[in-house]
Amino acid sequence: LIKDVFVVDASAHSYNLREDNYAAGRYSRAVVDAFHGAHYGLSPVGYRIPRERYTRDWTLAETATMLFVESDYDFACHHVTPINAFKDGGCSIQKAREAREKWPGRFQVYAGVDPVFPEQALDSLEQQVEELNPVGLKLYPNSYTVDSVVGWHMDDPEIAFPLFQRALDLGLKAVAIHKAIPLGPVPMEHYRMDDIDAAAAAFPDLQFEVVHGGFAFIEETAFQLARFPNVWVNLETTANLAVAKPGAFERVMAGLITHAGEGALDRIMWASGASVLHPEPPLRWFCERFQFSQEMREREGLPEITDEIKRKILGLNYLRMHGLDAETLAKNIEGDEFAVERSKGKPKPYATTYAIGFAE
């Protein structure tokens, strides 16, 4: 990897995809289909898990070893995912608590609530702040029932704005909103970018992460980066295009810079999306191979992607947003259990998980 790089995964999860965790019938199955479809379609050979071995309850320990032993990550933000197609939201509060209590040197956490139920959302946020000491809030743009989908918008003064204000009052720094990739047969309306504008303008002291930024709506995302200094791009899933469709990843990055300027590179954050996908392949490709082609640089006026820029994207941007220091964090994890295991050599993909031996 790049010398002296401190790698941060801006959004990791440990999903429970078991059928007995379904809460919304066909919509639950559709969300799981979307996850496994992304996993299989964006993973290289040797990193693909068959559906029957994939749709289970992934433990926090598995996510941790995939990141810190099987891959070269140093730190991660573990999200509570409020996807109410699952009884526990998909990635439970309990797993986030485990991350904070068991490996505080390796994890921060984001709380997660469903804004469609405003009073419950506010109460749950306060409870999670007390329990988890989160630094941010994870949101999804729609909610599910057994037979319907209900969406909401980031610029809604009655649903969204009171939640953002409460997050600020509770000391949270960031709101991460899932965009661009629809979860199942749901209206695309709520996955578009337009509603972020008013939220970013109304809450300049909150940082808004566009999760899956650039996977769709590249120009809209870029213009938000250009206009709002508190809008950031979280590359979860988008990063995996680097391996599966490198030309598409190049176009995403070029589009963000072309419309937002080189300053956008200070607000793009690396993320793997583990456990949906294995975190190692896109990281390795980005470090070793990502560069704009000479033709594209000349045609679009793009900069060379230096090691310094890669260090920012891979970790320093996230750390700056949250007021963290890479050197201090690196000292905190020296000689911990993951560092010891990694020093023995990198295991094969999924060798430290219950999916050992099933990668295709």
What are these regions (language model features)?
Residues 11-17, 178, 212:
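Histidine-centered divalent metal-coordination motifs
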Residues 23-28, 94-95, 193, 227, ...:
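Glycine-rich, phosphate-binding/catalytic loops in enzymes
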Residues 74-182, 187-190:
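Active-site gating/metal-coordination segments in enzymes
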Residues 18-24, 90, 122-124, 149-152, ...:
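Short aromatic-enriched loop/helix-cap "lid" or pocket-rim segments at secondary-structure transitions
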Residues 58-64, 91-97, 121-125, 193-196, ...:
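Alpha-helical scaffolding within the catalytic cores
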Residues 11, 68, 76, 109, ...:
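Divalent metal-coordination and catalytic microenvironments
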Residues 1-10, 17-66, 262-267, 277-360:
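Mid-to-C-terminal alpha-helical segments outside catalytic/metal-binding sites
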Residues 31, 135-136, 149-270, 275, ...:
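Catalytic pocket-lining loop regions of alpha/beta-barrel enzymes
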